[in-house]
């Protein structure tokens, strides 16, 4: 593999790396390392073994849910990917979520969140507890972020499309943890991205560094005392990395840099490498992931703690309802549907947004004036005076949380064909001999059955992938048209 790198970039890297420069340049001649991160929200006993049987995976040393996969393998095309079983993510970027610490039952903000890798990582750690706000300033990227939040089955996430400065005027001293994976000059992407090589310049590095400081200022206003700020980039430029941390702390001396101890993943190989220290006065406390020292494209990360004592969060309009509450007509229809749900939903958190019924995160906040793409979990909507469950609800449910479940074993040809047919939008006829084998099973209240009527949670290998509606042995497909695959 050959790529032409900008001369000024090479000159700077030669000065920065010294004797390591040749090894760094040599790393550009090898193939990309690719990774996937298992989704804990979908994890079951069978899933890891199923993935291992299909792909030559091995652990990423700094991320217990992360795995490398083979260069010629395509897990992004797998039915399991459509079902949210894992997220495709560059291996070195997986360190960021691991540095967030124990964020269960906390208020967490992913400030520059698209396309959703860090958000899904944080959500997996939170395991449905607390509040996760995922923000993206660019509308099209915010839509992709929202789609990935849905695919990964995240219940407790609010997706916003705002500038950091506007959010900082609302959420003053509010969050326990903020992740800032700031837009950068992308030097860690240059080996695999021609656009990153073409657009690189010293001026762009300078502009990114200045923008990064503005974003950090917004994050500072939103982080409560005692809170944790995780700052990261996918660039090697000191102006955007160590220098950015030094400049920020010079303006806000109440912050200290914390070197979090990472535990090496069981089964990982010594040859896969490990994050290094950085440079400058905080060099021994920040993380540099160099492409010539480990198996990844490269990343920078630092953990900053604001002050010493943890304080109460600001209220951010706390206590104001978002929506107009339950109305009697749809309330009755939803109550009828909810009899099939085997998980309890708090009535205090169920609100309407137009015709949509939403399950808001436990932490209720006032979002008036904020562009919101997804306000927690979309339960469903009123269609012609009947309740129709949303795809997001299906993706968030486990098989044991719904009355009627179709589970398909994708390890067989018969099962894989049924999965592809479902994801293509076809109805599934369980009366057909090809649909009645051991690979395709219908359950009602956990007991295998041959027929049922009404809504069915369609699953693959024990994880949900969408809704169907059954009558006389035929499951009508309710997989969203915009997500359907071409056969």
Residue ranges and their predicted role:
Residues 140, 177-218, 234-241:
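Mobile active-site "lid"/loop adjacent to the S-adenosyl-L-methionine
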Residues 103-104, 168-179:
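A short acidic, Gly/Pro-enriched loop at the edge of an enzyme's catalytic core
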Residues 1-16, 20-52, 297-300, 307-487:
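Polybasic, low-complexity RNA-engagement segments
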Residues 127, 223-225:
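Helix-to-beta-strand junctions that scaffold the AdoMet/dcAdoMet cofactor pocket
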Residues 175, 228, 236-358:
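Class I S-adenosyl-L-methionine
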Residues 105-114:
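Conserved class I S-adenosyl-L-methionine
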Residues 137-172:
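S-adenosyl-L-methionine
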